[in-house]
């Protein structure tokens, strides 16, 4: 993955993103951790990550995203998704509640970034 970031920079790509799909036949690297490592090879262009909000605790996610955003002067772009039933089942999440969990997670993250107590 680190080599891919370097190759993307050398190829002149405009942005760098990682996904959040825990159920995959391919090797999966936790997005926050791998993106932090990839930044050393990326440079100062926009970067970001997808997070399937129903699968995340909002306080942990708010901390991780704020940390990532602080690692580079380049813009960090947060992508938010709902996920599918396979992702939820793998994490023990009832995906019938995914829209509510998504909205709640986003509200808590925004409140924390504004300095509010939650």
Model-inferred region functions:
Residues 20-21, 50-52, 81-83:
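Histidine-centered beta-alpha loop that forms part of the nucleotide-sugar donor binding/catalytic region
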């Amino acid at each position: 993955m680190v080599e891919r970031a370097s190759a993307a920079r050398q190829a002149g790509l405009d942005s760098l993103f990682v996904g959040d799909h825990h159920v995959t036949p391919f090797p999966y690297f936790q997005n926050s951790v791998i993106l932090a490592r990839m930044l050393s090879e990326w440079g100062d262009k926009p970067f970001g990550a997808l997070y399937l909000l129903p699968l995340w605790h909002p306080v942990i996610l708010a901390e991780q995203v704020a940390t990532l955003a602080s690692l580079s002067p380049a813009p960090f772009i947060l992508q938010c998704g709902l996920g599918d039933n396979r992702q939820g089942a793998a994490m023990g999440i009832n995906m019938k509640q995914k829209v509510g969990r998504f909205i709640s997670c986003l509200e808590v993250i925004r409140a924390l970034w504004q300095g509010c107590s939650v």
